[in-house]
Amino acid sequence: MTAYFAFFAIMHSILADPRFKTWAGKRFGNVFDRWQRLAYTVLALIMILPFIYIFVSLPDRILYIVSWPGMGLTAACQALAAIALLAALRQTGITYFLGLEQIKRASAPGGLVTSGFYCHHRNPLFFFAALFLWLSPIMTLNLLAFNILATVYFYIGALHEEQSLMAEFGPEYEAYKKRVPMFLPRLKC
């Protein structure tokens, strides 16, 4: 599981790297600019399928099951994390995130989002995804391994993403970084 996850993470990171995008953009031009994000998203979904198969077919054992009423509380918090994740995704722009907006025009408008969840922390998508994973009321050995790997990947992915945002937005993003924490949300904007 760890080896395939590492392969997925490395491929996902290479394809998201600004240097790769610049290289491929020069090589393939406007076609790449329009289709890159959608291809990236579809490839990620395809690459996750073998991981899911590996995950469910490995021997596993339960580490804990949260008893009632704690199970209800953790499940409710998990649902809230999922709702917040979807709201942050909507705020980012779902069609832009998926790559559908870029198909219409190669340089889809995308300004730096600093309001809403992004006013409280710079990486709400990673934060809420990690929160959703760790709030599972049932923890197995495989799920624990996955949660650790995913959390490490979210952190590395956030660092990678911040390099891209620095390259794209420069001083505006630098100022944003100085006033807004990376993961742990601040209460006031």
Residue map of PLM features:
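A generic, lipid-embedded transmembrane alpha helix
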Residues: 39-55
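Hydrophobic transmembrane alpha-helices
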Residues: 1-11, 107-189
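Transmembrane alpha-helical segments that form the membrane-embedded catalytic/substrate-channel core
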Residues: 4-18, 50, 54, 78-100, ...
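Juxtamembrane "helix exit" motif at the C-terminal ends of alpha-helical transmembrane segments
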Residues: 50-63, 136-139
